[in-house]
């Protein structure tokens, strides 16, 4: 975004994001790389935890356009679980053990049960519709109970409270990217939220998000046919 300060964070893996801006500022000041003839004149920092940080300054707007890019996309999907990267993109909006739940201690056993049931479901032969339907109904039932503890859209509310705009994400063949546009004076608070987001994501509201991913896929397929 040429009209804003741009930060692109590239994660080597889905791992906890360490941060302490003040402590490391002096250390980082003279330890960056640059790309020759880069029109954005970006500085590229590599933190001790392997995190790559790209900084490009534009002084006309007191806001920060942020991208957290995870180097995993649809080409990394297992052959028996296509769409997994896109699904994970959606699940990273569902909170952690510290936010997104009314009572995580009560919710957690149900989420573990759903996971175990789904793994069992995946092992059933596709032609065995009777057992697949039976197990899916069981998954659906437990998911309904677990959903009673979920707080919908809490991540979105948290970033909205610090003035974020354009909160979104997308999945490509090689990356999954999480997007926000935040006030520059809320950078440290945003880092706290994102650090927590990646520390221990909890995959709650399983059914709801699975349906949302399928709906997006159907819309994309329909659009491609209309443009053909």
Question: Model-found features: residue ranges?
Answer:
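His/Glu-rich zincin catalytic helix
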Residues: 4-8, 12, 16-150, 177-184, ...
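Alpha-helix-centered segments that form part of catalytic cores
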Residues: 143, 147-163
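Acidic/histidine-enriched alpha-helical segments
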Residues: 104-109, 202-218
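Catalytic zinc-binding patch centered on the HExxH motif and its immediate surroundings
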Residues: 46, 57-59, 162-172
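Hydrophobic face of alpha-helices
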Residues: 85, 152, 191, 207-210, ...
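Short acidic/His-enriched helical or mixed secondary-structure segments at domain edges of catalytic enzymes
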Residues: 214-228
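Short, glycine-/polar-rich solvent-exposed loops and beta-turns at beta-strand/coil boundaries
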Residues: 60, 81, 170-173, 206, ...
